[in-house]
Design a protein with these regions (language model features):
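Small beta-barrel nucleic-acid-binding modules, primarily SNase/OB-fold domains
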Residues: 1-100
Length: 100
């Protein structure tokens, strides 16, 4: 279930935050609809970075579809979200390039 542009709820009840994704004003609905369309009855895979939790104890993940689509990066490319730049993570520079 898509909760927000950067949060999803898994079938097992675990809430995860899409690592590197920051909500963008006026594009929340577009981002949520994009994620709902991409996740529609598909299996997803989670990949963790060196830091698994943020300062608010949110579990942070990179999300991939079964066809290896990198959801975090694809979402940034749509322009519906911004790149989180307040802390370091391994895909930060890649995400910044994708946002340009």
């Amino acid at each position: 279930e898509v909760i927000s542009p950067n949060k999803i709820l898994l079938n097992n009840g675990t809430e995860i935050k899409l690592l590197g994704i920051k909500e963008k004003d006026n594009f929340t609905l577009q981002a949520i609809n994009y994620l709902k369309e991409k996740f529609n009855k598909r299996k997803i895979y989670l990949k963790y970075d060196l830091q698994k939790y943020d300062k608010n104890n949110n579990l942070m993940c990179y999300v991939y579809l079964d066809n290896k689509t990198f959801i975090n990066n694809h979402l940034i490319r749509t322009g519906f979200v911004d790149v989180e730049t307040n802390f370091d993570y391994s895909c930060k520079s890649k995400f910044i390039k994708s946002s340009m």
